[in-house]
Amino acid sequence: MKRFISLSLVTTAVLLNASEVTSLDTISVVETANSKIVKDVSDEQIKSADLAEALSKNVPSISLVRRSGIANDIILRGQKKDNINILLDDAKIYGACPNRMDPSTSHVLTNNIQSVKVIEGPYDVENFGTLSGVVKVETKEPTKDVHGEINLNAGSFGYKKASATVSGGTDRFKLLVSTSTEEGDQYKDGNGNDFSEQQIEKNVPYTNQYSNTKQKAFEKKTLLTKGQFNINDDQEIKLSYTANRSDNILYPTGSMDADYDDSNIYTVGYTARNLGNFSKELNLDYYYSDVDHPMSTTLRNRKMTPNSMMTMDPMVSRLKTSIWGSKVKNSVEVADSLVTVGLDTSVRNWRAVDTATPSIPSSDTTNKAIFSKIEKSFGKLDLEFGTRYDYTDVDTSKVVNPEDKKYVGLNANVFGIYNIDENTKYFAGVGKSSRVPDARELYHSTAGNSTLEQTKNYEADVGFDKTIGTFNIRPKLFYSVLKDYIYNSGTFENIDAKIYGLDVSGFYFMTENFSLDYGMAYQRGKKDGEYTGNDKDLAEIPPLKGNLALNYEMTKSKYTAEVVAVDSWDSYDSSAREQELGGYAVFNLKYTNQLHKNIGLTLGVDNVLDKTYASTNTYQDITYLTVNNERILFNDPGRYGYVNLKYSF
């Protein structure tokens, strides 16, 4: 009953922070009240390095946006890109590509992750721009004792990965170093077609097809280093550096591929505890991250027909982005309440480079904010109040009709849990949040609209958590009213809309060895008022999704059989160039065995039945290749087998 013990521990944590909604921290789902925890990302999610895929398989309200064999994106309760915040060790990192080739989730690998916490809704006041959710990724921490591990992984479609981690130190200083390298060929769908064969099957113009039909799909190398210096028992300094180097990532449904994606993340943090009556804990944090993303047609045919003698020069588009930020936060106990106040500031630059006519002119988004939280218990009732005031400038170097922007936002929320007893909890929250438009939405050469207002989200959430014996269920409802929602209708515009939905998750321990994990998520999105086009459905609102996993655990081994089922995508925005997708169900198998105290083995097969399906729709916010004015769909992987051998010490 290891999970039941974990559940009790997490319950205690949630009483201190009612707004924390999902945690990925080692993959066994332990949810309590308004929290979900998925554990052992680095140990369990070893099929590939793709964090987006790991999240979508373990959190019902997260859906995968597949663009390639790696570097995929996520949708959280019908929201994507800047509508959800992504933090890596409390640092922001943004992709540089306006076409989402390098989403924030692609800049960290699962083998380096200790935990991922997902807050659904407007219940985060500490970070700039959390409109409808925040994903907080925490990488591994250094240890005092010397520990390490080496992983060797191989899978279908030419996938190979090797990673190594070592950590150790003293009472005063600890250090961790982790590195990895991986590569993969073009995967094949359930019909046996790889990227090139899918292009040919869908009649993609010859000039857009790959010149080398056996071109590798991606190569990726990473480095993570972290250090911790303990000044004394109550004070510490932490430093980290994360490097990601990805080369030749193929995007077969687009007109270009990524020549490379290079990113760097630097963090410095200072923590002091028990400084006196006015400080229970003081945190000072600084981060800097940057991304360099050139994309081109270098790997395509670049001529009209196979017999054509004229080859076009490669088209190249290179963009860079960077952001630095700092935060000071102090917590103090006041009249049996925990009060937190803080200052937060950041500056993000985004620009197209190496061109006289940039698609995005160099633009700086500067935010300054003050925030506060109060956590208080009244008997069986636990409450958290939060508020944040933002002042944001957006300055552009645009030469023609430059329009700098200023935005002011006042946001607040309250979230509560009523504990009937140790097995029954009711929870509810209401809040308002906002996010400003980014440089692409304001100033892009073809789709930008410099008159955009910031988006406001007014949301309510309600649910309960009930355990009956060894059976647990956690249903949750949400209703979100979006004012001035930023929407791509060919050009960006503000519209009014609403998104509402339900998710249900839980577990059932049938015996000491058998257990069942389940989850379901459903959401709908509708436009209100005036909008371009005649379709009332919102784009990128995934259909009904269900997850069911049967586990059999013994002392040193574990068997898992999993089904992921998705309904047909028949509510879609045709005016935004989406289309109907068929439903599907995918069956996965996994086996792990601790062969020796130092050696572990994992075997798995995803999509056992070799199902052919497409999970991702074709919203016009992303540029897709078209055939007869129809955007081409891209099938997900067919049957995929993998094996991982781990040596730890």
Describe the role of every protein-language-model region.
Residues S63-L64, K92-E120:
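Short acidic/polar hinge/loop motifs at secondary-structure boundaries
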